Design a protein with these regions (language model features):
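H-loop (His-switch) and adjacent beta-strand-loop-beta switch element
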Residues: 213-226
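ABC family nucleotide-binding domain
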Residues: 2-216
Length: 228
């Protein structure tokens, strides 16, 4: 069976020459549909650069990336945009919510890009917010929500269009311990529902809660193990 994600000999080099930085240095990795994976590394390890590649937010200098059987290098900008809008739900450490929109409006945003009508958008966004326990906060703007609630809005936004892949970059990095548990439980439920969930993190406590841990250091994958 073809892996959902297949990366082979990927390089990303900044400042080529004497002072070059190999953010990704000959990285190869396969991830199958339905896996729950953490990509773990300290600051500067290359993990965020790798996330940008997996999310089709940036392009490597060399190497191959096949997503769902398609060579990403051969896709047009419109096709890449379509992947980001239909196949991948992004969750970021900084929430990235629009301050002047309420929770419902923030979750509706990716649905606008999909061309859905207003009523359909509201129904889907409302359902997504209910799934993350914010059915009573739909009309609240980000500054009226706690950090944990803001991240739950971000999760709802990521899952509203029902993408098969969830790509979460340090999703608990700005949260207290209670909110961290809540977000991880939501991500676990998303995995149980059949989605492929990939978490980028520096935190071993987060990594211990997933099925597979890929460690990256100095742009290289140094270990790939299954949690028992």
């Amino acid at each position: 069976m073809e892996p959902l994600i297949r990366v082979k000999n990927m390089y990303k080099i900044y400042n080529p020459g004497e002072n070059e930085v190999r953010a990704l240095d000959d990285v190869s990795l396969e991830i199958n549909q339905g896996e729950f994976v953490a990509i773990v590394g300290h600051s500067g390890s290359g993990k965020s650069t790798f996330m940008n590649m997996l999310g089709c937010l940036d392009t490597p200098d060399s190497g191959e990336y096949f997503l769902d059987g398609k060579d990403v290098a051969n896709l047009s900008d419109n096709e890449l945009s379509d992947i980001r809008n239909h196949k991948i739900g992004f969750i970021f450490q900084g929430f990235n919510l629009i301050p002047n929109l309420d929770a419902l409006g923030n979750v509706e945003l990716p649905l606008i890009y999909r061309g859905l009508g207003k009523q359909q958008r509201k129904e889907i966004a409302g359902e997504a917010l209910s799934k993350v326990g914010l059915e009573n906060r739909m009309d609240h703007k980000p500054n009226q929500l706690s950090g944990g609630q803001q991240q739950r809005v971000a999760v709802a936004r990521a899952i509203a269009a029902q993408p098969p892949i969830i790509l979460a970059d340090e999703p608990t990095g700005n949260l207290d311990s209670k909110s961290t548990i809540e977000i991880m439980n939501i991500l676990k439920d998303l995995h149980k529902s059949g989605r492929t969930v990939i978490i980028i993190t520096h935190d071993d406590e987060i990594a211990n809660q997933v099925d597979r841990v890929v460690r990256i250091m100095d742009g290289k994958i140094v270990s790939d193990s299954v949690n028992q």
